Structures are given as C-alpha cells and as structure tokens.
C-alpha cells in the first residue's frame, strides 16, 4: 500500500487570506459602508476607504442616498488625493453597489477588486475595526443632525485619529509623522492640550 499511496496529501492551491494580506498590505485598500442614525431618525450611509499599510482613512463621506456612482467617485477622489498613487488591490464585500460600473472605474486605475466571501466580515477585518472605532470613540457620543454635520464631526475625529500612535504601526501615527517618546520626563507645565470634538477627546503635545 505504501507503494501506491501518495507521500503527501494534496494541499489547497494558493496562500491563506491572512498571508495574502500580510504580503500585500502596503498595496491594498479596503472599502465598506456603515449607517448613521440622526437625531430625527434619518438613516445616513457613510462610505470609508482605508489604506491597510498606513491604517489611514483615505476617504470618508456621508450621504443619504448610497449609490455605485458615489462609491466610485469616492475611490477616484481618494486616488487623486494620493497624487494618482492607486492601490494594487481593493477589498470590498458582495453588496450590489459594487457593480460593473464601480469595478470598471476602479480597474481604470489598474486596481483589482477583491470580493470577500458571503457573510465573512472578518475578511475585511481592518475596515471593520476602523468602523468600530469611529462608532465607539465618536458617533456613539454625539447627536448627529444631518449628513453635513456627520461629515464635519467625522473629519475632525479622523484628523485626531491620524495623529495618535497606532499599535499596528509600532506606536507610530497613520499620518506618517515620526513620533518619539521624550528622552527625559516632561514637567506638567511643558505639556499642552488641544480639545477635540468639544472635549470628547484631547490631543497632547510638548509646549513650544
């Protein structure tokens, strides 16, 4: 039997999803939608695009009427904001909003869409985690009036988020600014504080 039995069982082709992401993290963006309920119980839809390598939110918009055109235009503007440096891959789920028109415009930048499996939010874990952070640290603590108000709040929070240390970046901030701990203890009077979102958060730095 040993003569006819294969020495090794056949393995599945290709690499694991986690391995693929790790190998291409600096070339990959991820996109997803989430909902926001206003003070008047209107449902708004926020669209977020995340650079996985930098953990940077490259685009975040809010609209009462989500569409493929809105999603595609958000991607285009994100690429232009990066001086035409488009990612190699874009991860998104199977929502019908990512239809032929969306994929065509994304492909025009040389970007390949990677569609996650059905009912598998963990396949877009980086984006899901950022959305969770936006909810817990921002939206769950404010009353949103409308889409313009939601965008203003989120823009202010994103500026704060991009400037604080991130564990996934070895305690460096997503905005790329090099952060180093002080060589010696800083006296309390040497620390300045900046209020974020009316005091919901505070950003700290060394006073000039």
PLM regions and their residue ranges:
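Charged DNA-binding/catalytic regions of mobile-element recombinases
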Residues: 1-208
